[in-house]
């Protein structure tokens, strides 16, 4: 009897233990399952986010391509001439989204060539060439010429460089690199693919000239360590590089010494005299003249320059050629003319003269006339009216985008500016 009772007691205790152990085991299992579920859900959510992010990275460029294709079907491009395969050239324009470069792009596209624009958008703007995006003959590449470029082309227009005083003084080292390393890279490309290269040089290589007007055989009167030297000397070195490659490597080069140019797509606050005067007159602010205003400049309209660049590229002239308008005016005359054309009540304000500001600049273009059959044809007032119209539209655009530009002086010395 005792043994049976004891057995039942032990059996009862074992059942209770088993139930307890089973309960603990079930609880532990449930806790483990819940923990794994929560962990897996977290991993899944993170994974889904990562996958979605990766998919978005892949899909976004495709969306952009689709938008460009849709635009190409609906967009009306400027009229383009048809050229045969033999006559159509593959042309590279460095700095092609800039002021002059974008007008050159228009000219070459409308002439029927295949144009590749390379720009790092330091001063260039996509807006300047967006009307060609999607066209089968056009390609836009975001690239800095200080890095090598590998592309098959027949001609290279090397325009890449900051060209207005505020821009090249803001980053003089970048300006030097663009005009030296960038030019070396483009010459190396021209050598590899057998292309002809045109360097957009500048009248600044003449410095503050002691000879007037300036012809191509004048060596200049320059300050190699002055505030503008990064640009002036950069272009002088670029010319030297071109002729070294021509003599040693047989590269075909053309060098255009470009004088003051104006027209639509100029930056309104780039610190140049024409853009400054137009912007000040439109905004009713004083037109700032540095010094007495007796300094002289000769301004050409941008379409004249573009025609000159194309004529030079397709010529047999390998020595430097001046491209500019020999019609000379004082800075004060420009201020008064722009004020009258705008119909502005702005006053003319005289400020202290800037350091290294050339007193006279006027091109001798006999060589261009004789060897290229080129000379400017757009009258000054006609060109200024076109520029003023563009600036009015640009001010409206900027106002709609909550940005009102102000004339931007070149920082030279104690806040002084210069006439470019």
Curated annotation (Swiss-Prot):
Residues binding NAD(+) are: 98-100, 119-120, 122-124, 144-145, 159, 161, 178, 200, 231, 235, 261, 267, 272
Q: What is the lineage of its organism?
A: Eukaryota, Metazoa, Chordata, Craniata, Vertebrata
Q: Per the UniProt entry, what species is this protein from, by scientific name?
A: Rattus norvegicus (Rat)
Quote the subunit structure annotation: Homodimer and homotetramer. Interacts with AKT1.
Q: Which UniProt keywords apply?
A: Acetylation, Decarboxylase, Glycoprotein, Golgi apparatus, Lyase, Membrane, NAD, Phosphoprotein, Signal-anchor, Transmembrane, Transmembrane helix
Give an example GO molecular function: NAD+ binding
| Residue positions with a glycan | 316
Q: What is its EC number?
A: 4.1.1.35
Which protein is depicted?
UDP-glucuronic acid decarboxylase 1
User: Topologically, how does it sit relative to the membrane?
Assistant: Single-pass type II membrane protein
